[in-house]
Amino acid sequence: MLMKRKKSGFTLIELVMVIVILGILAITAIPKFVDLSVEAKKAAAQGGLGAMRSAVAISYAQSVTTGTTQFPSSITTSLFADSQIPKNALNNSTSVASTSSIPSGTATSTAGWWYISASGRVGAYSDGTVDTSSW
């Protein structure tokens, strides 16, 4: 008696179904990863802003010990232990713009940060899409 030999492998229909399922999974997963990259940039910018505010606070505290209670007139690399101003992850800039008023939360600039020397306020400039006013 002759035995029929079983064919192994996938049919074209099975392969197409797998590709369709993978496509559907990719379509639903990609937007979630895009949102994560935006959140990561925001978190990195907030971390840099924390470093900027700490540097200003330390400089102010040092001026108090000498009896000249004043905020630094500008933010320079000398205020940081590694002699580098942190990069604003939203617009990839390390420069600091002096200003007399708080910019809007979505204000953009070539500078990464804004600084008001009269009050010691420091903030992050946006990339135009992220509102930084609540930071």
Language model features: what each stretch is:
Residues 1-10:
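N-terminal leader/signal peptides at the extreme start of proteins
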Residues 11, 28, 43:
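Conserved Walker
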Residues 11-14, 64:
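Hydrophobic, well-ordered secondary-structure segments
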Residues 16-32:
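Alpha-helical hydrophobic helix detector
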Residues 38-66:
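Membrane-proximal N-terminal amphipathic helix
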Residues 61-120:
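Extracellular/periplasmic head regions of type IV pilus-like filament subunits
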Residues 122-135:
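Short, low-complexity, Pro/Ser/Thr/Gly-rich segments in the mature regions of secreted, periplasmic
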